[in-house]
Curated annotation (Swiss-Prot):
<dbReference type="InterPro" id="IPR006545">
    <property type="entry name" value="EYA_dom"/>
</dbReference>
<feature type="cross-link" description="Glycyl lysine isopeptide (Lys-Gly) (interchain with G-Cter in SUMO2)">
    <location>
        <position position="52"/>
    </location>
</feature>
<keyword id="KW-0597">Phosphoprotein</keyword>
<keyword id="KW-0217">Developmental protein</keyword>
<keyword id="KW-0963">Cytoplasm</keyword>
<keyword id="KW-0832">Ubl conjugation</keyword>
<feature type="region of interest" description="Disordered">
    <location>
        <begin position="1"/>
        <end position="66"/>
    </location>
</feature>
<keyword id="KW-1017">Isopeptide bond</keyword>
<keyword id="KW-0007">Acetylation</keyword>
<feature type="binding site">
    <location>
        <position position="354"/>
    </location>
    <ligand>
        <name>Mg(2+)</name>
    </ligand>
</feature>
<comment type="subunit">
    <text>Interacts with SIX3; translocates EYA4 from the cytoplasm to the nucleus and promotes activation of their target genes.</text>
</comment>
<dbReference type="InterPro" id="IPR042577">
    <property type="entry name" value="EYA_dom_metazoan"/>
</dbReference>
<feature type="binding site">
    <location>
        <position position="352"/>
    </location>
    <ligand>
        <name>Mg(2+)</name>
    </ligand>
</feature>
<feature type="cross-link" description="Glycyl lysine isopeptide (Lys-Gly) (interchain with G-Cter in SUMO2)">
    <location>
        <position position="14"/>
    </location>
</feature>
<keyword id="KW-0156">Chromatin regulator</keyword>
<dbReference type="GO" id="GO:0006281">
    <property type="term" value="P:DNA repair"/>
</dbReference>
<keyword id="KW-0904">Protein phosphatase</keyword>
Length: 616
């Protein structure tokens, strides 16, 4: 400190006799550049040869006394856009020298990169410049909207390491918080770009000669450049002094925590600053956005990830979602594998199977033979042969041995447990499904189900059944094989002869409905789902009934099946129920659906005629 006092006294004494000494132009420019950081100049006086305040260093300045014995430095400053000269005293903020000295006409400012930050330690020297406890930061010309606001804290100088781009500085309170942090810019800052803040997304070693202060805001960092503020073309119409214009204090947030929200794309400045207040011209160039919306949407992941503070309720919700999602992960595409109903659908025909479309149960009991005067033993024999073929097909190809105790109403009822695994090489015989089902009795009439692994194997079987049905619904002979195919065709012919072409007449009506684009056939049967599918295949009904339109009422009853059908197709269409029993008639009455009773061949013929004449 004593060296500093002696230095001040020497400076005062040596100024007067050497005030008229002329120095080369380049020497004066270096000295005026050094005045931009007077604390750095004094800080270098501790080492020999590094002192700037010698005789030649004071040749271009004058020292006066304010009457109290305190020496004040007076520097003649020349604003860029005004003919008036202003005098700034050493009591002002440090950044006043930067804005005036560097941009004065006739001087060539030295590049800030020529100075090393180690040469300028930022130690306070109260004998040269008084440093108040809460130092005020002076605003620059044209930014009068921040006057009278609270004083900021001391900020650390940051430098611009990346290529900056310009943002308008007029309404900072609105625009600055919404600035996106983006890097990779190729445009360079022009010295004539006025009225803008120089913005850089990165930080490096502070360079005091370039950026006296920086102001950090949430999501971004702003490093004011002395050149930018010196060229500010908006004049200070109210002539406020530097002490009356203060920046508000900003809360410092790290920039990197917001970088993941935005794409690191290349953008140019998107605003042109051509209008000036004092008549000077501005040559700020206009840049257009270089990236289209397609390029922005090509990186959706960067915008979806939001790192927000966690709350107890949110944590609980996240745990709930994770626990529920663990069971359904990979099933989203299997939740509704059935195609949605057609939008132009107008009428749904709900059919019963036994004794309506086919004659099967009455053959086994002999009731059909008695009613129509047929040979009862022959009828029962044909019924038993067809029953054997039905269950043989169900056991051999449709996993009825595994699924008999695990019956479902619809083929897609367990599809939510299917993870979509490829079944082309899957071994159903060795996956242990049947043994687990038999030992643990996991399929109960009450609806109790097994574990996740077992349910997945169950879903695999129903998916395989669906694939076989869709593959062979019009070619059952290919599924049965040559030997069984001949026996099946022989049996079908004998049954048709005994029943007087009952099935043929029913197929005529089904065919008419199937050819209509606004109508659909739905089958509801009291038979279990797997044997019902086998019946449909063996009676050549696969073309009339898609597997998604087949429901088994064994577990829930026909009325509940009708409710499911209505919920699937909607209430704005007409439902026609066709059957022979009291169950379907009662269910139709409960849902106000018209019922067409089938009790004889004449009923089938009348239905066919009504469909041909489009009464139905």
């Amino acid at each position: 400190m004593e060296d500093t006092q002696d230095l001040n006294e020497q400076s005062v004494k040596k100024t007067c006799p050497e005030a008229d000494v002329s120095e080369p132009q380049n020497s004066r420019s270096m000295e005026m550049q050094d005045l931009a950081s007077p604390h750095a100049l004094v800080g270098g006086s501790d080492t020999p040869g590094s002192s700037k305040l010698d005789k030649s260093g004071l040749s271009s300045t004058s020292v006066t006394t304010n009457g109290t014995g305190v020496s004040l430095l007076a520097v003649k400053t020349e604003p860029l856009h005004s003919s008036e000269s202003t005098t700034t005293t050493g009591d002002g903020a440090l950044d006043t020298f930067t804005g005036s000295v560097i941009t004065s006409s006739g001087y060539s400012p030295r590049s800030a990169q020529q100075y090393s930050p180690q040469l300028y330690p930022s130690k306070p020297y109260p004998h040269i410049l008084s440093t108040p406890a809460a130092q005020t930061m002076s605003a620059y010309a044209g930014q009068t909207q921040y006057s009278g606001m609270q004083q900021p804290a001391v900020y650390t100088a940051y430098s611009q390491t990346g290529q900056p781009y310009s943002l308008p500085a007029y309404d900072l309170g609105v625009m600055l918080p919404a600035i996106k942090t983006e890097s990779g810019l190729s445009q360079t800052q022009s010295p004539l770009q006025s009225g803008c803040l120089s913005y850089s997304p990165g930080f490096s070693t502070p360079q005091p000669g370039q950026t006296p202060y920086s102001y950090q805001m949430p999501g971004s960092s702003f490093a004011p450049s002395s050149t930018i503020y010196a060229n500010n073309s908006v004049s200070n119409s109210t002539n406020f002094s530097s002490s009356q214009q203060d920046y508000p204090s900003y809360t410092a947030f790290g920039q990197n925590q917001y970088a993941q929200y935005y794409s690191a794309s290349t953008y140019g400045a998107y605003m042109t600053s051509n209008n000036t207040a004092d008549g000077t011209s501005s040559s700020t160039s206009t840049y257009q956005l270089q990236e289209s919306l397609q390029g922005l949407t090509s990186q959706p992941g960067e915008f979806d990830t939001v790192q927000s503070p966690s709350t107890p309720i949110k944590d609980l919700d996240d745990r709930t979602c994770r626990s529920s999602g663990s069971k359904s992960r990979g099933r989203g595409r299997k939740n509704n594998p059935s195609p949605p109903p057609d939008s132009d659908l107008e009428r749904v025909f709900v059919w019963d199977l036994d004794e309506t479309i086919i004659v099967f149960h009455s053959l086994l009991t002999g009731s059909y033979a008695q009613k129509y005067g047929k040979d009862p033993p022959m009828a029962v024999t044909l019924g038993l042969r067809m029953e054997e073929m039905i269950f043989n097909l169900a056991d051999t190809h449709l996993f009825f041995n595994d699924l008999e105790e695990c019956d479902q109403v619809h083929i897609d009822d367990v599809s939510s447990d299917d993870n979509g695994q490829d079944l082309s090489t899957y071994s159903f015989a060795t996956d242990g499904f049947h043994a687990a089902a038999s030992s643990a009795n996991l399929c109960l009439p009450t609806g109790v189900r097994g574990g996740v692994d077992w349910m997945r194997k169950l879903a695999f079987r129903y998916r395989r059944v669906k694939e076989l049905y869709n593959t062979y619904k019009n070619n059952v002979g290919g599924l049965l094989g040559p030997a069984k195919r001949d026996a099946w065709l022989q049996l079908r012919a004998e049954i048709e002869g005994l029943t007087d072409s009952w099935l043929t007449n029913a197929l005529k009506s089904l065919s008419i409905i199937s050819t209509r684009s606004n109508c659909v056939n739905v089958l509801v049967t009291t038979t279990q789902l797997i044997p019902a599918l086998a019946k449909v295949l063996l009676y050549s009904l696969g073309g009339a009934f898609p597997i998604e339109n087949i429901y088994s009422a064994t577990k829930i009853g026909k009325e509940s099946c009708f409710e499911r059908i209505v919920s699937r197709f909607g209430t704005n269409i007409t439902y026609v129920v066709i059957g022979d029993g009291r169950d379907e008639e009662h269910a139709a009455n409960q849902h106000n659906m018209p019922f067409w009773r089938i009790s004889s061949h004449s009923d089938l013929l009348a239905l066919h005629q009504a469909l041909e004449l489009e009464y139905l």
